[in-house]
């Protein structure tokens, strides 16, 4: 299993990001929100933090945890655009405990 996160996999470009937000399906959790756009030719991912989270240290820690979660579970995500928005509740969890099998859709279906 390739657990790397190459730069080519990071979603970039203002137009593409705003298009992804408009055409996405949303999955909610207490710790983060996942937005996904499935019909896209390659796997792209974006990591963000809610605006409510104050302090650069907290925001950076949340993004680090999200990247780690994605890297470790990369094979469970379909090809498409994935946007992870972290919430402050994520800081209360240890990095090795972040695992949400209930909200990760299987590779075969739409949901």
Regions found by a protein language model. Name each.
Residues 1-111:
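Positively charged, solvent-exposed patches that mediate nucleic-acid binding
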């Amino acid at each position: 299993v390739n657990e790397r996160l190459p730069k080519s996999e990071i979603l970039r470009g203002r137009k593409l990001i705003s298009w992804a937000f408009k055409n996405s399906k949303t999955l909610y959790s207490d710790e983060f929100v996942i937005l996904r756009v499935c019909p896209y030719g390659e796997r792209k991912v974006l990591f963000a933090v809610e605006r409510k989270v104050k302090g650069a240290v907290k925001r950076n820690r949340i993004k680090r945890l999200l990247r780690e979660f994605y890297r470790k579970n990369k094979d469970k995500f379909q090809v498409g655009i994935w946007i992870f928005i972290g919430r402050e509740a994520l800081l209360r969890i240890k990095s090795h405990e972040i695992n949400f099998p209930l909200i990760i859709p299987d590779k075969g279906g739409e949901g």
